[in-house]
């Protein structure tokens, strides 16, 4: 089962993909979106769905640290609903608390990426990888 992991922000969507066995997640790209112009990145996602023969999506749910839901959760669920309607594929959700912070730490400490501009380009993809990998790990059938 091949899944796309998405880290949906207000301006970008980080995209990761699972391998065909659903074991590992790899970063793919960052898609620019503009909600004010109703550009939700569906065209590039459609291309990826076709290219990789995707079976579904995993979206991060940006819950508050105390577990409550805020506006960002509602936005993520609305994006998920849009994906379901557009692609007729299942959408799963995964807690994304701290994924952006963890991505930043990995890029700075582990990869030595101190250039802020370069890091910004990759951080959404890394967050998508963490969201997807967390989901895959929780749902792995050993």
UniProtKB/Swiss-Prot annotation:
One of its GO terms (cellular component) is cytosol. Transmembrane segments: none annotated. It holds the Pfam family RuvX. The keyword Cell membrane does not apply. GO terms for biological process: rRNA 5'-end processing. Keywords: Cytoplasm, Hydrolase, Nuclease, Ribosome biogenesis. It is found in: Cytoplasm. Its EC number is 3.1.-.-. GO terms for molecular function: nuclease activity. NCBIfam families: RNAse_H_YqgF (TIGR00250). Belongs to the YqgF nuclease family. Could be a nuclease involved in processing of the 5'-end of pre-16S rRNA. This is Putative pre-16S rRNA nuclease.
């Amino acid at each position: 089962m091949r899944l796309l992991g998405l880290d949906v922000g207000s301006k970008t969507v980080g995209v990761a993909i699972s391998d065909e066995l659903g074991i590992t997640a790899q970063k793919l790209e960052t898609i620019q979106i503009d909600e004010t112009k109703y550009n939700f990145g569906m065209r590039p996602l459609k291309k990826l769905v076709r290219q990789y023969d995707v079976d579904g999506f995993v979206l991060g749910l940006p819950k508050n640290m105390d577990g409550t839901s805020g506006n960002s959760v509602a936005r993520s669920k609305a994006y998920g609903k849009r994906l379901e309607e557009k692609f007729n594929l299942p959408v799963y959700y995964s807690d994304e608390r701290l994924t952006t912070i963890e991505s930043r730490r990995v890029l700075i400490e582990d990869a030595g990426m101190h250039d802020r501009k370069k890091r910004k380009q990759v951080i959404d993809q890394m967050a998508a990888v963490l969201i997807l990998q967390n989901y895959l790990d929780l749902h792995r059938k050993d």
